[in-house]
Amino acid sequence: MRTAQQFYKELGADGLALRKKPEHTRLELKYLKKILKKKQKILDLACGYGRFTIPLAKGGYDIEGLDLSPNLLKKAKNDAKRSKIPIKFIEGNMTKLPYNEKSFDAIICMWSAFIELTKEEDQIKALKEMLRVLNERGFAFIEIPAPQKVFRNLKTKRKDVKSQKIRGRVVQSIIDGVLANPMYLHNKKTMEKLMKKVKPRRFKISIEEFGGRPRTLVWMWK
């Protein structure tokens, strides 16, 4: 099966950036600034090219980023250097985070990064890793597509995105002619089931407008 590294290497940082409308990013950043505090130690998990890491750091937030794609991290580091902002970027996998216990007060995991883990056991590992590196009373905020949005894409006639199911709840798309890595389709019920297996102190799952479009928002507190 195609890996995330292969997809992002082929799509490239610039190609990925073109997939996100500036207005979406602006609204999402505004939301993040409301839920995060500058005194917190924050991890941007699956940070990509630093779409949120860099502007949050510019705004005075204590944040660092982790991603599994070397080419996306290269752009993030170069952009941060150009902006003269010291940000720590690390290559790594969310199923085995290279951090000590209780390293962060908050974790954000944006776009569709979490559901690129197509096996439930890997998703459980990632959630447990988030809890491990969070401080007591810390939280993780995960954003994934709303189920109705994904199923609509399965029927879309858009020329830039074509999606199809490949097994169970896993979908694969072709984006701008590039075969994307598969994604696991979660709805509110399946996400709740996953959380009950991980057993955080508290969690909340909602489907609401985020960045000007319907998204599934997942909160998890240690």
Question: Would you name each region that the model predicts?
Answer:
Residues M1-K37, K39-G48, R51:
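Conserved class I S-adenosyl-L-methionine
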Residues R51-K96:
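Class I SAM-dependent methyltransferase SAM/SAH-binding core
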Residues T95-A106:
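A short acidic, Gly/Pro-enriched loop at the edge of an enzyme's catalytic core
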Residues A106-E121:
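A short SAM/SAH-binding and catalytic strip from SAM-dependent methyltransferases
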Residues I124-E136:
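A short glycine-rich, Lys/Arg-flanked "PGG" loop and its adjoining helix->strand segment in the class I
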Residues F141-K196:
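SAM-dependent methyltransferase
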Residues E209-K222:
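Core SAM-dependent methyltransferase catalytic element
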